[in-house]
A protein has these predicted regions:
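Catalytic core segments in nucleotide and nucleic-acid processing enzymes
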Residues: 46-47, 58-61
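A short acidic/basic microdomain associated with nuclease active sites
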Residues: 1-5, 72
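Ligand-binding face of N-terminal immunoglobulin V-set domains in extracellular IgSF glycoproteins
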Residues: 64
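Nucleic-acid nuclease catalytic cores
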Residues: 49-54, 67-105
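Intrinsically disordered, low-complexity Ser/Thr- and acidic-rich flexible linkers and loops
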Residues: 25-31
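Non-catalytic C-terminal interaction segments of nucleic acid-processing enzymes
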Residues: 89-174
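Conserved catalytic cores of phosphodiester-cleaving nucleases, focusing on short active-site segments
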Residues: 12-23, 37-50
């Protein structure tokens, strides 16, 4: 979409709840505090990052992902040049969007080159706009809320990406 909505929709979103990492009483106590354990992530996915496209790709990720606790620019092929990598590191440090090098053959082999700067609070205005414009995102938030309240991840409620992330990424790279 052109205009005001062009760079608002991330390619992929995710969340983290420490249900398997924390004791039940800690999870309950956390729910009483202002420091919520739920974390939202946003990802902009590209086939490659080169000298020709990195600025546009990075600032698209800034625009699409700054609403979340952490935002990332993800690419399979990232130019391996010291000067180029230093520039990516500078951008990540300055604007807070991290860089992930994706290994589509082995998702677990992917690595964070430069971590995102975590945000304490979410950009609620942008989240509201995303929900108004994107039914899938609105449903995603509803499902996360249900999981948070029930203290159980209902994996069947999430889209096909979680079922076969490698296939989703390969399709996205076409």
């Amino acid at each position: 979409k052109g205009g005001y909505n062009e760079w608002i929709h991330p390619d992929m979103v995710g969340f983290y709840l420490p249900l398997d990492d924390w004791r039940p009483n800690v999870i309950e106590f956390n729910r009483l505090s202002d420091n919520n354990s739920l974390r939202l992530f946003s990802f902009e996915i590209k086939k490659a990052l080169t000298k020709a496209n990195y600025r546009e790709a990075y600032f698209q990720a800034v625009s699409n992902s700054s609403w979340a606790h952490e935002g990332y620019l993800v690419a399979v092929d990232i130019l391996q040049n010291d000067e180029f990598l230093a520039e990516l590191e500078r951008l990540a440090s300055s604007f807070g969007i991290g860089i992930i090098q994706l290994d589509p053959a082995d998702i677990d082999g992917s690595r964070i080159l430069y971590p995102a700067r975590g945000r304490v609070s979410l950009d609620w205005e942008t989240i509201n706009k995303l929900c108004e414009q994107n039914r899938d995102f609105d449903k995603f938030l509803q499902d996360v809320k249900i999981d948070y309240e029930s203290k159980r991840i209902h994996r069947t409620e999430f889209d096909e990406v979680s079922k076969d992330i490698a296939k989703y990424i390969k399709d996205k790279m076409k």
